[in-house]
Each structure stands twice: as structure tokens, then as C-alpha cells.
């Protein structure tokens, strides 16, 4: 079972920051970055599925050094390898372009059985990237997952979704698929000292936008 876990770097909410001169975003030069919270839940879910079904977890992120930082943290948590999409064109503002870049990277890596993302990012909060990613890949998708089980033989996933008003829904999707994971779906593990040391020896690939065909 091969699982991609998408991780977005966001400004640490405890960081003091200011608006840039053009008043379009914050000044990121001195900001501290961390993984978007929901993406940590997605990574934890990926690690649990790997532990149950064997296989590998591939962490992927777009951006500069801030992306490399969250990928190293993901490796320390337990991901098997990381793909850093590092290029000016691999840091677009639109979710559409982000989803396209992620899709091309997954294809370049030979595809996968499952892609997990957080339900939304802590900064923009649109919740659109995962759905767009599924569309680019031509795969089924399920959103706002709070529970997930896989059947490798039938290549299906049963997803428990949290709907508005506290309602729950169970759906079955055919693999490969993209699933977005809700806040609080599990308890993300802390990176151990052993995990931090092991992360330094794990494969860490750096690809440009041109290399993934963007």
C-alpha cells in the first residue's frame, strides 16, 4: 500500500507578523512555519494505515525552505520518504495550480494507492485543493473524513464523513482515491528522538516544476 500525504507549510499562529507593502499577504521573511494542523491528522492516518497494511508513506510539499522544514518533521513522525517541490512556479497562490503540481508529482513518482490531505489549510481555509487534486488525477474522492478503513483485496476504502449538524455518513470509494481528513480525526504522534535521527537518513527528493511537467 503506497500512500501520499500532502503537507502544507503555514505561518505558525504564535508568530508575530505584519502585512507586506502591497497589502496582499503577510511578510514571510522572518515568520516561523509549521505544518497546517489538518495535514498532521492526515499524516497520522497515513502512518496508521501503513502500520496495518504495510507499504510506504510518501510526504510531499510545495515551497521553499518552509516546505523542506515540514517535510523533515513528517519524516521524523514516520513517513518513509519525502518529495520537496521546490521552484518559484511550484509555489502558486491558487489552489488550482497547487493541485495540478501535486498531481503531476504523484504521476512522476509512479502513482499511488491513496492520497491523504487535511480537510483545509490553516491560512486560506478553502478546502478546495484535495477535491481539485482528485479531479486532476481522475480519481474518486471523499472529504471531511473522521474514520477510514481499507480493503486492499477489493481496492476500496470505507470513509466515515462528518457532515453539518453533527451528522455522519459512510461512503465507499474505489482506490486509488483522494481523501481529506478532518480536524480531530485521530491523535497525531510526536516525533521521538529516534524518529528525528532516522529522518536524516531517509530519502529526500527535490523536484522542480519543470521536472514534474509544469
Language model regions located:
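N-terminal glycine-rich FAD/FM-binding segment characteristic of electron-transfer flavoproteins
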Residues: 1-214
Amino acid at each position: 500500500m503506497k500512500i501520499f500525504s500532502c503537507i502544507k507549510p503555514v505561518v505558525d499562529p504564535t508568530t508575530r507578523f505584519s502585512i507586506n507593502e502591497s497589502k496582499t499577504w503577510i511578510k514571510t521573511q522572518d515568520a516561523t512555519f509549521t505544518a497546517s494542523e489538518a495535514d498532521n491528522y492526515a499524516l497520522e492516518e497515513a502512518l496508521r494505515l501503513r502500520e496495518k497494511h504495510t507499504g510506504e508513506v510518501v510526504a510531499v510539499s510545495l515551497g521553499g525552505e518552509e516546505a523542506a522544514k515540514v517535510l523533515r518533521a513528517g519524516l521524523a513522525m514516520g513517513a518513509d520518504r519525502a518529495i520537496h517541490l521546490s521552484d518559484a512556479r511550484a509555489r502558486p497562490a491558487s489552489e488550482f495550480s497547487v493541485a495540478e503540481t501535486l498531481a503531476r508529482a504523484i504521476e512522476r513518482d509512479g502513482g499511488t494507492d491513496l492520497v491523504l490531505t487535511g480537510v483545509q489549510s490553516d491560512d486560506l481555509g478553502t478546502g478546495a485543493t484535495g477535491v481539485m487534486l482528485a479531479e486532476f488525477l481522475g480519481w474518486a474522492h471523499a472529504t471531511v473524513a473522521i474514520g477510514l478503513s481499507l480493503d486492499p483485496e477489493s481496492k476500496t476504502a470505507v470513509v466515515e464523513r462528518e457532515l453539518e449538524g453533527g451528522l455522519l455518513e459512510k461512503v465507499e470509494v474505489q482506490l486509488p482515491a483522494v481523501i481529506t481528513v478532518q480536524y480531530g480525526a485521530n491523535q497525531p504522534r510526536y516525533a521521538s528522538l529516534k524518529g528525528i535521527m532516522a529522518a536524516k537518513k531517509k530519502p529526500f527528493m527535490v523536484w522542480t516544476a519543470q521536472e514534474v511537467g509544469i
